[in-house]
C-alpha cells in the first residue's frame, strides 16, 4: 500500500493563521499555511509551548484564531463543527464514570438523535473495531488507561466524522501500551481512512504513524518544515527497525534541533490560556 493516500483533495486548508493570547500578549501561532488532503495522517511535533495543541484546537473550532482562515470541506471551522465533521480525542479519555463502555460510545449518537436500534448496531461495530467486544458493560474505572483511550477513540469515530483530531492521546501511557495502541490506531485508520491530525512529543511515534510530519518552531509557532513519510503501509513492529525509519527520525530530529528544540519546557513558559 502506498504511504500517501490516492485521494489528495484538500479537506482542511489553513491560510495566514495567527493566534495571539491577548491576556498575556503572546503570539502562539504566526502565519501558518497548511493544506491537509483527504485520508492523510498528519502529525504535529515541536517544542513545548510551540502551539501544536493550539493549532489543532483552532482547526476544531475550540480556539478562535486572531487572523487568517481555516476551511474544512469548503466550510468555516465553525460550520464544520456544527456539521459534526470532527471527532476529538484528548490526552485524558474524558469518559463518564457512571456510563458503561456501551453508553459512553453511544453518547454522541444519542445527541444526534439516532434511534436505539441504529445506536446499538453502531456501538457493536465500534467496540469490535477497537477490540473491546466483551467489555461493553464495564465502567471506565474497571478499565486500564489504554482501554479507556480505545473507548474514547470509538466514541470519537462513532458518528463517522471526516476528521479525527488527536491531542497527545497516548502521552500518559507506558511505552509498551503506547506502541500497541499505535498499531491499533493505524489499523483503524486504514479501515476508515478519516483524515487524522495527531499532536505528539514523540519523534518515533510521529514517524511511525504518519503520511507527513509537520515540524513546528518555538514560539511564535511557525511551520519549520514538513517531512513526507515514505514508509509503506501497513506498518508493523518491524517498521521501527527499518533503516529508512531511522533516517526519517533523524531528519525530523535535525529539523527540531535547528529550530530550538533544545529549549526545555520551563524555558518556554505559556501565557494564561495558551495551549501547547
Feature locations, PLM:
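The feature captures the beta-strand-to-loop junction immediately N-terminal to the Walker
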Residues: 45-47
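Helix-to-loop junction immediately C-terminal to a conserved catalytic motif
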Residues: 60
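ABC ATPase NBD coupling module
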Residues: 75-92, 111, 116-120, 237-242
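Short coil-to-helix segment of the ABC ATPase nucleotide-binding domain corresponding to the Q-loop/switch region
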Residues: 99-107
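Conserved ABC ATPase "signature" region
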Residues: 110, 117-135, 187
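Conserved signature/switch motifs of ABC ATPase nucleotide-binding domains
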Residues: 138-141, 159
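Hydrophobic anchor residue at the start of the ABC signature
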Residues: 153
